[in-house]
């Protein structure tokens, strides 16, 4: 017997029993961005490696340790995309979408990072993201946060997530703070863990994101970035909070929130949950006004967020909010005998035409009555439509209820569509 080939570690199949929940989440995401007037953009899975080195930053875990990078036959270094923002900016620059324009975009698709697989964190994962270009004011920051809050409302998890908010200021303010932070960290260098010592000079703000308890206790006395903000950055952050207060979105200012990517400035945020253990961040984003120019375009303000769908699905399962996921089939059509097969197929086709949202499965492969009913029940359908010689002669269909104790009944062929429309609405 030939050896079975398994999926690559950390890259998972989404099976038919799981896909309805994914489809529900995806439908909520699509409907929510449509309500705000955002347009979809689709970019390639493979990009030039330099795109991510220049955008994410060379001294980041993603670039240093996690990217799937390889050389093609021409010797060019290519990478499976680890996130969606850099590709969106690259596409915007390449196709002239960003200069002197406003764009509200969204994307959804697989991303790849070579990290240790664990619940809610995989090597291939699916990311949904929102990107806005050409608007530099705080009201658009508020809009993307309102959009994110709408997602939780529509998914029924608003009570289980919390918004954390911070500002990183502009590059000049951050540079001044960077020097102050380095000076502080140098005083405690011997107590820092290896990662923090490595980042202390190359990317000191990332030390603020350390999970090491000893480092966190040291940082309690670190200088605060808020003290280094100029008037414009302070006003931007104050206006954002005022707008969030006005629409009733609750948040917590977290001065240690810096995000893991180098390109953020001013507003940064995370939605977090206590229901997933260590994988508590379910959505994250912020403002990245310098990224478009950094990747070869003109200076363009930008803000957005991204979320991993695996983590959202896991959260819904953890909270046991998957009960209302419908079965893949509404109606199962069975022919009671070979002489009725043609009629059964015609009935199924007519229903698909007259009731396009009705999910109709036809029994194929023959078998006796017991076998067909067993298949109908397993399909998850509400009812089975039985067509035998007697039904054929009388121009009726027998409706057998599969999810309750209602007695089966006969329905005239010419009234079947109206009957099922009422039954399944």
From Swiss-Prot:
GO cellular component: cytoplasm
PROSITE patterns: AA_TRNA_LIGASE_II
Database matches in Pfam families: HGTP_anticodon (PF03129), tRNA-synt_His (PF13393)
InterPro entries: aa-tRNA-synth_II (IPR006195), aa-tRNA-synth_II/BPL/LPL (IPR045864), Anticodon-bd (IPR004154), Anticodon-bd_dom_sf (IPR036621), His-tRNA-ligase (IPR015807), HisRS-like_core (IPR041715), HisRS/HisZ (IPR004516), HisRS_anticodon (IPR033656)
Subcellular location: Cytoplasm
Gene Ontology biological process terms, A to Z: histidyl-tRNA aminoacylation
Catalytic activity: tRNA(His) + L-histidine + ATP = L-histidyl-tRNA(His) + AMP + diphosphate + H(+)
Keyword annotations: Aminoacyl-tRNA synthetase, ATP-binding, Cytoplasm, Ligase, Nucleotide-binding, Protein biosynthesis
Entry EC no(s): 6.1.1.21
Predominant place of localization: cytoplasm
Single GO MF annotation: histidine-tRNA ligase activity
Family recorded in the similarity comment: Belongs to the class-II aminoacyl-tRNA synthetase family.
Subunit organization: Homodimer.
Name the UniProt record assigns to this protein: Histidine--tRNA ligase
Organism: Shewanella sp. (strain ANA-3)
């Amino acid at each position: 017997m030939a050896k079975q080939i398994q999926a690559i570690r950390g890259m998972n199949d989404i099976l038919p029993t799981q896909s309805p929940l994914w489809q529900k989440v995806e439908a909520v995401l699509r409907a929510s961005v449509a309500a705000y007037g955002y347009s979809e953009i689709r970019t390639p899975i493979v990009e030039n490696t330099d795109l991510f080195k220049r955008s994410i930053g060379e001294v980041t875990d993603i670039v240093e340790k996690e990217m799937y990078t390889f050389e093609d036959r021409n010797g060019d270094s290519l990478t499976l995309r680890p996130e969606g923002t850099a590709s969106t900016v690259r596409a915007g620059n390449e196709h002239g979408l960003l200069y002197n324009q406003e764009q509200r975009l969204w994307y959804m698709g697989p991303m790849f990072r070579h990290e240790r697989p664990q619940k809610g964190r995989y090597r291939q994962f699916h990311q949904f993201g929102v990107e806005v270009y050409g608007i530099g004011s705080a009201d658009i920051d508020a809009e993307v946060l309102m959009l994110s809050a709408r997602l939780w409302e529509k998914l029924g998890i608003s009570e289980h997530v919390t918004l954390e908010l911070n500002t990183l200021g502009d590059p000049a303010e951050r540079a001044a703070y960077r020097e102050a932070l380095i000076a502080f960290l140098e005083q405690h260098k011997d107590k820092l863990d290896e990662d923090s010592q490595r980042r202390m000079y190359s990317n000191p703000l990332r030390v603020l994101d350390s999970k090491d308890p000893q480092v966190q206790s040291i940082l309690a006395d670190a200088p605060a970035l808020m003290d280094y903000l100029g008037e414009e950055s302070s006003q931007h952050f104050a206006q954002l909070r005022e707008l969030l207060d006005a629409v009733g979105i609750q948040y917590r200012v977290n001065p240690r929130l810096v995000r893991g990517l180098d390109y953020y400035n001013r507003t940064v945020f995370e939605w977090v949950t206590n229901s997933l253990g260590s994988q508590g961040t379910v959505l994250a984003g912020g403002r990245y006004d310098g990224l478009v120019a950094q990747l070869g375009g003109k200076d363009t303000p930008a803000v957005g967020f991204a979320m991993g769908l695996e983590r959202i699905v896991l959260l819904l399962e953890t909270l046991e909010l998957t009960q209302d996921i419908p079965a893949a089939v509404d109606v199962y059509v069975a022919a009671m005998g070979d002489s009725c097969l043609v009629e059964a197929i015609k009935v199924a086709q007519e229903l698909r035409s007259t009731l396009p949202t009705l999910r109709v499965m036809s029994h194929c492969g023959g078998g006796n009555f017991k076998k067909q009913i067993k298949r109908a029940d397993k399909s998850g359908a509400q009812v089975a439509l039985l067509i035998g010689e007697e039904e054929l002669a009388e121009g009726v269909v027998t409706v057998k209820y599969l999810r309750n104790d209602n007695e089966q009944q006969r329905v005239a062929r010419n009234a079947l569509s109206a009957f099922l429309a009422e039954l399944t609405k």
